[in-house]
Amino acid sequence: MLNFKNIHIGQMIKERIAESEMETLRICNFFNCTEDEVIEMYQQENLPTDILLKWSKLLEYDFFRIYTQHLILYAPIKSENPNREKSLLPQFRKNIYTREIIDFILERIRTNEMSKNEVIERYRIPKTTLYKWISKYSLIKAK
């Protein structure tokens, strides 16, 4: 399982390259860089977003989703402020719960590390959503 708390994006890129069996020459041509520069990127814990976007396109994998999962699991609880102005930034409604996140949460319940209510409160997952996961993936019985 991925470590969503401590993200080392260079290592994840390296793993994805190994999975896809992509040639280093192709990567160097895509980035217009040397093999040493590619190896240096593997060692980076963080990369600039424009570089990460290129990696996502080249490897056909959404590396940004890893950071989204981190926000779901570890961001502080949102404070309700009715006086706050609406953001000019787009508001996304796309389903951001990947199978890895669902498995991570269900595993915490299955091992009694957390109760269903604790999961709902800590990760702000709607109760109906959690119970649908439990039913759909039938790893644990809904009570």
Residue positions per predicted region:
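A short, Lys/Arg-rich alpha-helix, primarily the initiator
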Residues: 1-20, 88-90, 95-111
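Short alpha-helical "recognition helix" segments of helix-turn-helix
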Residues: 23-28, 117-123
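DNA major-groove recognition helix of helix-turn-helix/homeodomain DNA-binding modules
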Residues: 50-66
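Short, charged recognition helix plus adjacent turn
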Residues: 67-96, 113
